[in-house]
Amino acid sequence: MPKRTLEEVRQFVGNGVRLLMIRAVPDGESNPLFEETFALFKDYYGEHCNDNTKPYAGVVELIETLKKKGYAVAIVSNKIDFAVKELNDLYFKGIVPVAIGEKEDIRRKPAPDTVFEALKELGKTKEEAVYVGDSDVDIETAKNAGMPCISVLWGFRDKEFLAEHGAEYYAETTEEVSELIAKIEE
């Protein structure tokens, strides 16, 4: 398999693990080694999902602030569900009660299914919710769920890319996320 640059990998992520591997493996699913490679990747990721992983600066404090203000918070990701739950327990235990990742019985983002599942578990409606994300997939997911979306600028996509994909609200800092949520709520 070819080595991939960081920029290539950054462009591959966001649409789920299988599509990540389809993009990364030459000839995608047509490659006779694809399924074996995909299985190896999932096993490796399961053992190493926490390697070089940590919350972005200020995110834990943002979540704690939002919870103190009475907001409910959930994580919805296209990462493998067991990894999402493991990372949530490691970094956000006690402050994020719902964390949902990619699993076979529910469509992944940009379909709104995981968002609706999170809202159901939180006892909230889409009218009470704001989606916060860092990608075009997040913008599309929020649109499909009928929710406003705040696009953060510290993730894998820049402001120009997000604007090209329909972003309406931007946050450069976690403080701006909190301010925008209050503004959208008005």
Question: Which residues make up each language-model segment?
Answer:
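Short glycine/serine/threonine-biased micro-segments
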Residues: 12-14, 72, 131, 153
